[in-house]
Design a protein with these regions (language model features):
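Active-site segment flanking the S-adenosylmethionine/decSAM binding pocket
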Residues: 1-53
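Rossmann-like AdoMet/SAM-dependent catalytic core
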Residues: 41-165
């Protein structure tokens, strides 16, 4: 739709799969949630499930959505340029290539996304559904047996987190 100025996607789960179905240049500006726990180097997402619920997928609430690299790469294919994230580093901002010259922003290098994934949000849960405030590698360790889709190959591959981290 050529009339959409701002599009925001934050469904705590299958954001990547929704983006995949959208047409190119679907808005001028897009804000897309990503999972900072997945880091900056892996191009991964959770598998598609129609009624995805992050707390049911894993009790910790840490295995959901897609990595920033996965979101960035699909947005490039849709005609967008990554311009940064919010302060909590969980929402990525993109501008359509058609409008990027109308704003005076420094465009980040896509090869170095590391500084955009160090989230200061600590929302992990214990098996008793209590906040556990995990950070760093402890977050990956607790979700190591969760299935994800590795999008870095020509044919996406279903793996467990422990297979790629």
């Amino acid at each position: 739709n050529k009339n959409i100025d701002l599009f925001s996607l934050d469904v705590d789960g299958i954001d990547y799969w929704i983006l995949k179905e959208l047409p190119k240049n679907f808005s001028k500006i897009a804000i897309i949630e990503f999972n900072s726990t997945f880091g900056s180097e892996k191009e991964i997402t959770v598998p598609y499930k129609e009624n995805f619920d992050r707390s049911k997928y894993h009790y910790s609430n840490l295995c959901y959505g897609a990595s920033l690299k996965a979101i960035n790469n699909i947005m490039k294919k849709k005609g967008f340029i990554f311009i940064g994230t919010n302060l909590h580093r969980v929402n990525a901002f993109f501008v359509s290539k058609k409008y990027i010259n109308k704003i005076g922003l420094r465009i980040p290098k896509n090869k170095d996304l590391k500084k955009y994934v160090d989230s200061n949000i600590r929302e992990s849960r214990s098996k008793n559904n209590l906040l556990s405030y995990l950070s760093g590698k402890k977050k990956i360790q607790i979700i190591k047996d969760c299935e994800i889709i590795d999008l870095s190959k020509k044919t996406p591959k279903r793996l467990k987190i422990k297979d790629i981290f």
